Amino acid sequence: MLAYRYLGWTLVVYGLGYVLAPIEPSIDIAPGSLWLWLASAAMCMAGLRVAPWLQRQWQPAVAHATFSLRQASQRLNLLAASGLLCTLIDRYALRGVPLDFDFFAARDVLEATAPTAIGVVGALLGALACFSLGLMVARATDGERLTSLDWAHSVAIFSVYVGISMGVGSRSTLLVAIISTMFSVIWLRKAWGRPLHLRYWLVPLAVLLLVAVISAALMLERLDLMGLDPMLSIEYSGYAYTVRPSSGTLLWLTEHSDSAPLLVAGFSLLQYVYHGLFEFSLFAQEPFVEHTGGSVTFWLPLKLLNVLQLNLGTVDFESIAGWREGIFTTFLGPLYLDFGGLLPVAAFLLFLALGLPAAALHRGRLALLPYCSVLCALCVLFPVVNLLDSASGAYPLVASMIVPWLGRRRGQVQCNEPTPDRWQAP
């Protein structure tokens, strides 16, 4: 997997989209902040570009013949179902999250109570559900005959995983799961030399459109719970602080706010997508930031250690000068909070580390497809949000590292890894 290309094309499409979008900034980006962001983004691409070369120096090309897709898929579904059950027990039985689908009440309870050990285990194992459909597609692409029950199991696990997240008003889990699955489908067909017919591009576009509609509907539901008009969100939300609709667009939205509330909520998604770079500029200009040395980027390992009663502490975001809750600062904002002026160096090293497993997939390690699908989602959402800073990205990334062990078999066995004569690495 040449991950740097995904990141590069994402940045190009993001820039072109900004030029065409009917939005205008409320503030000017400071040149110094912009150059820092661009330099750091370039270093992220450089880290991904160097990773394949470095991986070749460390590990010569060898044949991997001990990974069974069928075994990995079946074990993954079992563990994912167990993890989702643990998550439900933790949230609704142990921590008292209400069952009335009130997003804000659910979030208040989760923020006021500490996760139990059952909840942490459930979050890690449940995140395997993100790859349930992707592995089923891999099995089908490899020629295995799958029953309707096989597909039903995976669809059910995938749906429950997304539904649990949407129950607290989160859209990012849905987005990560969909992007990861779409990447797996397209990548697998290219890897096996199968044609990518028009439907394989139209279906992902239709799915992304559906995700946008669902996200807009969720936003309307949240605004309704808050008793706010959608137009107020466009003009006065945290996103609107830096990005507003153009004058003509604002007039049109005002005239149609009652007849087309979904379009109004959809415009909020544009603000959601494009406000991060401007927020990064504001935050990078804050002179009194106390940098956290990695506690934000690597919050999940710290959380796991804290569950073991090591009490390493957490980041108090409310005490950080210039940090605003409820907004995003692209992928690089949390990394800047951690490392400050060393951001380009930190970005290079982080993406070098992230790119090494992706390089192994490019050389035939199909077991790493789930990991690379999350990395693809991370690259696609790079200009918007840092997935490592959220449960929707960090847990699947860690969980994906379990997959190679789930399909590992001892001895010489029939293996689903693509052999050199049919492998065409994208």
Which sequence ranges carry the predicted segments?
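Membrane-interface helix caps and helix-loop-helix hairpins in membrane proteins
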Residues: S26-I27, G163-S172, P383-A391
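Transmembrane alpha-helical segments in integral membrane proteins
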Residues: A127-R145, V264-L277, L352-P357
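Membrane-embedded catalytic interface detector for glycan/lipid assembly enzymes
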Residues: R56-L225, P334, V413-P426
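Small-residue-enriched transmembrane helix-hairpin modules in multi-pass membrane proteins
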Residues: V213-A347
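Hydrophobic alpha-helical segments
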Residues: V315-E318, W323-P426
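Hydrophobic core segments of transmembrane alpha-helices in multi-pass, intramembrane catalytic enzymes
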Residues: L36-M43, G126-G134, S172-S184, A347, ...
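Membrane-interfacial loop-to-transmembrane alpha-helix junctions, especially the N-terminal start
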Residues: L2-L11, A72-N77, E144-S154, A360-S373
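A structural signal for hydrophobic alpha-helical transmembrane segments in multi-pass membrane proteins
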Residues: M1-A93
